[in-house]
């Protein structure tokens, strides 16, 4: 293997700005920013918009209103579909 071609693997401080959560993770990400962690050590710093601490899939706070809206729209659109056939059958008898 060629020397000095691989990125440096190190501990990096990731900050989820939406949930204000910090994660120390081993990574090869290239960043010039550093920040001091609560343990007193200064680590390379990367800000994240979304992580497992703030993503609705992982937090269990999924937006069910969108799904309920789709179901309500479907039921509203096809509400008369099944009832029209029943009325015609009842009127024919």
UniProtKB/Swiss-Prot annotation:
Pfam families attached here?
Ribosomal_L31
Instruction: Name the Gene Ontology biological process terms.
Output: translation
Gene3D superfamilies for this protein: Ribosomal protein L31 (4.10.830.30)
Can you list the GO cellular component terms from the UniProt entry?
ribonucleoprotein complex; ribosome
InterPro entries assigned: Ribosomal_bL28/bL31-like_sf, Ribosomal_bL31, Ribosomal_bL31_B, Ribosomal_bL31_sf
Q: Which UniProt keywords apply?
A: Ribonucleoprotein, Ribosomal protein
Which GO molecular function annotations are given, in alphabetical order? structural constituent of ribosome
- Claim: Ribosomal protein is one of the keywords in the record: yes
Indicate whether Ribonucleoprotein appears among the record's keywords: yes
Could you tell me the superkingdom of the organism this chain comes from?
Answer: Bacteria
Quaternary structure and interacting proteins, as annotated:
Part of the 50S ribosomal subunit.
Record-stated family? Belongs to the bacterial ribosomal protein bL31 family. Type B subfamily.
Know the name of this protein? Large ribosomal subunit protein bL31B
